[in-house]
């Protein structure tokens, strides 16, 4: 990854790291901070959890929890090393571009799968919206509500979902093309 592509990938990964942290009961800003420190030290061979602790002031248990989470998702990898002054083994954490590219590709495929399911669902169902507050309801929900908005009492109107579906299909097509490009770049022989 070079230039703008790298910056975009790092930003995408940071968003992913924040969401991953939040879903696992970890402070998102702490996980993002650790991720950025590892990213900055990757060209130098990585950074140890002891160094992360001294740089951030975070508790070692929190740091290790974040490292384990990022490692499990193959965002970072570790290598074993020796402490320069002690005889203890240390682990140095770094971002491995090969595994991270595969992780991003896997994530894109999961997003694509969800979008395809949404497109199939949306194309087979009609929706109703409230012209006053903008609330959206499926046909079944609108039927149950007697086609009256429960928030403001306005009569629900059938929504024209063609434009939204077309936008969703363009997004799906673009993501499929991006996945194909990524696969050819990652798996080229």
UniProtKB/Swiss-Prot annotation:
Pfam families: TFIIE_alpha, Zn_Ribbon_TF. Residues 9-101 form the HTH TFE/IIEalpha-type domain. This is Transcription factor E. HAMAP family: TFE_arch. The gene is tfe. Belongs to the TFE family. One of its GO terms (molecular function) is DNA binding. PROSITE patterns: HTH_TFE_IIE. Transcription factor that plays a role in the activation of archaeal genes transcribed by RNA polymerase. Facilitates transcription initiation by enhancing TATA-box recognition by TATA-box-binding protein (Tbp), and transcription factor B (Tfb) and RNA polymerase recruitment. Not absolutely required for transcription in vitro, but particularly important in cases where Tbp or Tfb function is not optimal. It dynamically alters the nucleic acid-binding properties of RNA polymerases by stabilizing the initiation complex and destabilizing elongation complexes. Monomer. Interaction with RNA polymerase subunits RpoF and RpoE is necessary for Tfe stimulatory transcription activity. Able to interact with Tbp and RNA polymerase in the absence of DNA promoter. Interacts both with the preinitiation and elongation complexes. Signal peptide: none annotated. The keyword Transcription applies. The winged helix domain is involved in binding to DNA in the preinitiation complex.
